[in-house]
Amino acid sequence: MRLTALLPLSLALLASPTLQAEELPKAIQQLQAKGAVIKGSFDAPNGLRGYAAEYQNNGLALYLTPDGKHVLVGSLFDEQGKDLSAEPLKKLVYAPMSKEIWAKMEKTAWIADGKDDAPRKVYLFSDPNCPYCNMFWEQARPWVESGKVQLRHIMVGIIREDSPGKSAALLAAKDPAKALHEHEKAGKASKLKALEQVPEAVQQKLAANMALMEEMGLQATPAIFYQDDQGNLQSQQGAPRPELLGKILGKR
């Protein structure tokens, strides 16, 4: 799994333990000082010692030479062409990252679209004025209405001046799921109005959603997150092409 498939993510997003500086060789500490976050170490061939790091929002393999004074940075391949860095980075960097992101999204103020017992959950950062969010809502109807998928809309407001107020109106509705359904079903004819006075509790929910979006480095909607058949976190920016719907939503 590549981090680029997950969209840019802030280093601050992750709270997994890192190796303490005093446990690391000086050469590795020098890279720490340049911003590399060491997530763990792993065995490597020919006397090398591998370290899995996170740097500038990407997983990075570091290889300490046997003398402990030099570091090789990048992928290491064997004579069969196998990338020996891939599995350690997946285990030590990307897997914990996926769990952390999913857990953070679970705690947001999302609006459910579909049955609670649907076997597949899909999160999307959604703006009420976003035509591509509405397009994805339409695309997902067969999966949602059959009970196979629940979409979880993390409401934000970034497209127009009244977007935050409209998201607040949905979050403050007596039945947010019903309000969202009516808004999306109506499309351009939606009569959703922005709240002029937003309750403090709703404002806090919306602010938290916006903060997470910013923390994850996301700049547009819809930003869609789902788990593939192996449980790996994947993402899609924008309304997906029809041939990608099966990957995101599962079997129809």
Can you say where each PLM-predicted feature lies in the sequence?
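C-terminal low-complexity, charged extensions that often adopt amphipathic alpha-helices
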Residues: Y94-I101, V144-E145, P222
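A short, surface-exposed interaction/processing loop segment used at functional sites
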Residues: G68-A95
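Hydrophobic helical h-region of N-terminal Sec-dependent signal peptides
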Residues: P8-L13
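Structural alpha/beta surface segment adjacent to cysteine/selenocysteine redox centers
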Residues: A118-P128, N134-V198, E214, L218-Q219, ...
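N-terminal signal peptide c-region/cleavage motif recognized by signal peptidases
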Residues: A15-T18
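Bacterial N-terminal signal peptides that target proteins for export
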Residues: M1-L7
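C-terminal cap of thioredoxin/glutaredoxin-like
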Residues: E22-G50, Y55-L72, S190-R252
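A short beta-strand-turn-helix
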Residues: W102-R120
